[in-house]
Amino acid sequence: PDAVACAAALRRLANNRKIPCWIVHGGMVGRSENRALVKYLDLTLRRLDEVSLDSFDRIALVDTQPGTGNNPLPEDVEPAIVIDHHPIHKPTRSVGFTDIRSSYGATATILCEYLQAADIEPEPPLATALLYGIISDTQDLGRRARKADLEAYFYLSQRANMRMLSEIQHGPLPKPYYRHLYTALDNARIF
């Protein structure tokens, strides 16, 4: 959820400057929360295998870094921008613009600060998504939440659609989830 929300926020910042921005991802959107976020934000996502990276002037990574294995960016492609809250990885050091704040609990906090600095009031869908990014990555503010995360949480909670937040957090799970859960429980052994 943090990455989806951050991608939407970065797109909002780019669009504010009249810069076209596509959100590209590597595979399927699997988690029910991410599917709900994409739907709620009305995001058009493009799969990496459906675009030519050469057609972009710049590439940004949010909530991930090059060489970490959790993003689809080919190793021979260097992003221009990396914004993340995880500890810095060596390949990130050569990127032109980096904002790595490993003391933060969520990258959504960083993007919230960017929106505030640009004097952009996030619309309720974006505020809701960023709020959920913080909630998700900090496990309801119980894991690694810092002052900046708390400030962003309170700022966004005043602008978010709380009913939609609840629907995103507790959305329906697909039928295969229950089949897999049944299989796992049926095969579980106590030692």
Please provide the spans of the model-predicted regions.
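Active-site cofactor/cluster-binding pocket
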Residues: 39, 43-97
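Residues at the C-termini of beta-strands that transition into short coil/loop
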Residues: 27, 84, 103
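Anionic-ligand anchoring segments at beta-strand to alpha-helix junctions in alpha/beta enzyme folds, i.e.
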Residues: 1-53
